[in-house]
C-alpha cells in the first residue's frame, strides 16, 4: 500500500516511530534545500541521523508521487563521508519500504541516466560537487532523471520538520542491493552519444580527475575511442577531492598540457557533472566557449532549432554578441543548471549551460554530463582537423570579467542580502556609472557560504575599479 501524505498546519506530526529521532537533529530555520539539493559541512549540517530521516521522507514523498513503489538508485563521490551518508539514506529508504540499488563510486550524470533508463522511482547522488572535502551533499532526481522539483523538495523538508503526516503507518521493509554493474550501461551510452565511428587516435589528452567520481570511467572512455590519455589526480581520494585540482583549480592541468605537449586537456569537478577544457597553449576554454563550439556545430548540422542557446547571467558579453553574429538567439537565466534546464524545456532549446562547465544537450540526455561534454568537444576538434587553440583563436574575444567571493557565514544574512538597502544603493550607483560599458552581478551562492561579485567591462581597469568598490561594500554592510 502506498502511503498518502498530509500537512499538519503548524502542528508537529507524530505518526511514525522514526520521528523519535527528531531530538537528535537541530535543523536551521532557513530552508535545507538549496540550488542543488542539500549541501553543507559534514558533522554540522549533515549527520547520519539527518541522512536517515532524509532517506525515509524522500522515500515516502517519491512513493506518494509515483503511486507505486519502485527502486531508488544511489551513487556517491569519493569523499570520506559519502559511505556514511549513502548508508544512512539507504537505511531510511528501506525503512520506508523502498528497494535501493547502490552503485558506489560514479558520476552524478550516471545516477540521472540510470534512473531514467531503468524506470526507477528516483535517484540520489551523495556529493558536494566542487566543494572542499569536508563538505558533502545530497542531490535528488525524479523518475525522469531530472532534478527534483521545488514542490517535492518542499514535501521532504516538511517531513523532516515534522509537518507532514503519513496516513498509512504500516511497515514493509525494503531491500538494498549493490549494483555497480549498472554503471557499464552509462559508460556505453556516453560513447554511443558521439556515434560508433568515433576515432580520437592522434589526439593526446590530459584528464584532471580531481580525485573524484570520474577516476574509473573517464580514462576508460577516452582510451576506448583511441585517444592517448594522461591522467592527473586519478585515484579516489576523500581527503584531496577538489583540493587544488579539478575544474575550479586549473593550474596543474594547464602546466601538464604544455609540458606533455598535449592537444588539449579536460578538468572535471568532484562529481563529474561539469567540465572545463584547456587548449595546447594552456588557455582556459570555459563553458562559454564549449557552448559556442558545440552550438555552432549543431547549427551547421540543422540540429539547433531557431539557433537558440540558453546560458546564464554569468555568460560573457563577448560570447553573446559572437553568437548573435552567427544569426543565433541567446537567452539568459539565473545561475544554476536547473534554471537553464527549465528554460530549455520551456523554449524547446536543445543546448544550454553555464560558464562554469555545466552543459546540457537534450539530443543526448537531460542532465549536465562532464564526460559526455568532453568527449563531444574532443570529437569536434578531431572532425574540424584544426587544433582547439585554433578554434579559440577564431571564435570570439571575451570582455574582461572579474569574479570575487566574499565569505559570509550567517545563512540568514546571505539569504536576505537584497534587503540591505545601503548595499543595493552601491550596486545601483555602479550600474549607472557602467551604463552600456559592462555588467554587474551580485548574488548569494546556492552551494557555499559566499556572496559572489561579478563585474564585466570593456576594459580590465574599469572592471577592477568597480569590483573593488563592490567587494568593499559587501564586507562593510554584510559582515
UniProtKB/Swiss-Prot annotation:
GO terms for cellular component: cytosol. It catalyses: alpha-D-glucosamine 1-phosphate = D-glucosamine 6-phosphate. It comes from the Bacteria. Its EC number is 5.4.2.10. Keywords: Isomerase, Magnesium, Metal-binding, Phosphoprotein. GO terms for biological process: carbohydrate metabolic process; peptidoglycan biosynthetic process; UDP-N-acetylglucosamine biosynthetic process. It holds the Pfam family PGM_PMM_I. GO terms for molecular function: magnesium ion binding; phosphoglucosamine mutase activity; phosphomannomutase activity. InterPro entries: A-D-PHexomutase_a/b/a-I (IPR005844), A-D-PHexomutase_a/b/a-I/II/III (IPR016055), A-D-PHexomutase_a/b/a-II (IPR005845), A-D-PHexomutase_a/b/a-III (IPR005846), A-D-PHexomutase_C (IPR005843), A-D-PHexomutase_C_sf (IPR036900), A-D-PHexomutase_CS (IPR016066), Alpha-D-phosphohexomutase_SF (IPR005841). Activated by phosphorylation. Its cofactor is Mg(2+). The active site is at 129 (phosphoserine intermediate). The modification Phosphoserine is found at residue 129. Belongs to the phosphohexose mutase family. This is Phosphoglucosamine mutase. The gene is glmM.
